[in-house]
Amino acid sequence: MSNVDHAEIAKFEALAHRWWDRESEFKPLHDINPLRVNWIDERVSLAGKKVLDVGCGGGILSEAMALRGATVTGIDMGEAPLAVAQLHQLESGVEVEYRQITAEALAEEMPEQFDVITCLEMLEHVPDPSSVIRACYRMVKPGGQVFFSTINRNPKAYLLAIIGAEYILKMLPRGTHDFKKFIRPSELGAWSRVAGLEVKDIIGLTYNPLTKHYKLSSDVDVNYMIQTLREE
């Protein structure tokens, strides 16, 4: 059975043409991207690394990592976002290899090939997140690192990530997220450990609606990222 939710893919297919519009529904992704890339780069030094971006969408993170000197492959199952990523690459001149393939299928093809894997804002959009995590373990080299980000599952996350972001502030289209698919840090940590990845660090990402700014924080109640290591 394929670990693909076609309804989730359809959501982003419909919005794909606005992926690089910084005032569109993707503004939050553009705003948080520098914070996330810096956090990752500080931990792995992206320059010269072979990197896989799982669930790359229109390529916002992929291009940013390539600009840091990484050799980046971006994968996604959405045809329209990948087309946008490839078109933007022609405009920007940033070199990224994009492929329409699942993490599980690529793991069969390219085991232990990547120094770093990123899988940001993707796990809450697939039927079986643990399957993606296992695939990431298989693809990262021993001693390599895998970064995940997602949204916590609790009342505060429901209020801020769905009611606040989708209905009140209208930062995201209604229906972007499904609360049932949100993932607690304890669950993400457990799936990672079962897959063979050691959790090294966790950081939260908070939004101030008054200043309209994001910052990294110890508060992991809503958005958060984790750093994991495949031991040598």
Curated annotation (Swiss-Prot):
Coiled coil: none
Keywords, alphabetical: Methyltransferase, S-adenosyl-L-methionine, Transferase, Ubiquinone biosynthesis
Gene3D superfamilies assigned to the protein according to its UniProt record, in alphabetical order: Vaccinia Virus protein VP39
Any one Pfam family match given in the protein's UniProt record, by short name: Methyltransf_23
Molecular functions (GO terms): 2-polyprenyl-6-hydroxyphenol methylase activity; 3-demethylubiquinol 3-O-methyltransferase activity; polyprenyldihydroxybenzoate methyltransferase activity
Binding sites annotated in the UniProt record for S-adenosyl-L-methionine: 36, 55, 76, 120
Enzyme class (EC, first level): transferase
Domain of life: Bacteria
Keyword Methyltransferase: yes
Catalysis performed (reactions): a 3-demethylubiquinol + S-adenosyl-L-methionine = a ubiquinol + S-adenosyl-L-homocysteine + H(+); a 3-(all-trans-polyprenyl)benzene-1,2-diol + S-adenosyl-L-methionine = a 2-methoxy-6-(all-trans-polyprenyl)phenol + S-adenosyl-L-homocysteine + H(+)
S-adenosyl-L-methionine listed as a keyword: yes
GO terms, biological process: methylation
EC number(s) per entry: 2.1.1.222, 2.1.1.64
Transmembrane portions of the chain: none
Pathway: Cofactor biosynthesis; ubiquinone biosynthesis
Family the entry assigns: Belongs to the methyltransferase superfamily. UbiG/COQ3 family.
Function per UniProt: O-methyltransferase that catalyzes the 2 O-methylation steps in the ubiquinone biosynthetic pathway.
The protein's name: Ubiquinone biosynthesis O-methyltransferase
Species of origin: Pseudomonas putida (strain W619)
Lineage: Bacteria, Pseudomonadati, Pseudomonadota, Gammaproteobacteria, Pseudomonadales
Gene name in the database record: ubiG
